[in-house]
């Protein structure tokens, strides 16, 4: 079994390096951007069927998904620590924006507490991401 270990390690390493060098062509990138925008428009159209704060929450969710998808696309196009952090920040921001919108369903002290908790969670996530 030990005879296969170095060969396996070399094969895995070669596969990893080969896979990481596959960049998106400009046509693939453009098609992915178009797909992200089309998905966002479709999601937003679904949100328009809702009323009140439910519509606002739905729109924030759609924006968040779009922004996360864009950040992931950039990471796929040009993998880097900076782009990986941008993906994590987009996720944290989307979670925060939706949570803040959900707080609007509450009133008074409950709303204030909800907003403080959402902000604290967002700040902690940003701190963790930037600390990497």
PLM feature spans:
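N-terminal signal peptide c-region/cleavage motif recognized by signal peptidases
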Residues: 13, 18-21
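Surface-exposed, polar/charged faces of alpha-helical domains
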Residues: 24-27, 31, 38, 42-60, ...
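Bacterial N-terminal signal peptides that target proteins for export
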Residues: 1-8
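Serine/threonine-biased, Pro/acidic-interspersed low-complexity stretches characteristic
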Residues: 4, 22-23
């Amino acid at each position: 079994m030990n005879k296969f270990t170095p060969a396996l390690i070399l094969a895995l390493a070669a596969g990893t390096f080969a896979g990481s060098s596959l960049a998106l062509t400009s046509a693939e990138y453009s098609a992915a951007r178009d797909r992200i925008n089309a998905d966002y428009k479709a999601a937003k159209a679904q949100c328009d069927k809702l009323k009140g704060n439910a519509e606002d929450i739905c729109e924030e969710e759609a924006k968040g998904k779009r922004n996360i998808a864009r950040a992931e696309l950039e990471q796929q196009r040009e993998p880097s620590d900076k782009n990986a952090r941008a993906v994590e920040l987009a996720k944290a921001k989307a979670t925060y924006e939706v949570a803040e919108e959900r707080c609007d369903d509450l009133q008074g002290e409950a709303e204030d507490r909800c907003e403080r908790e959402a902000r604290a969670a967002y700040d902690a996530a940003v701190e963790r991401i930037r600390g990497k």
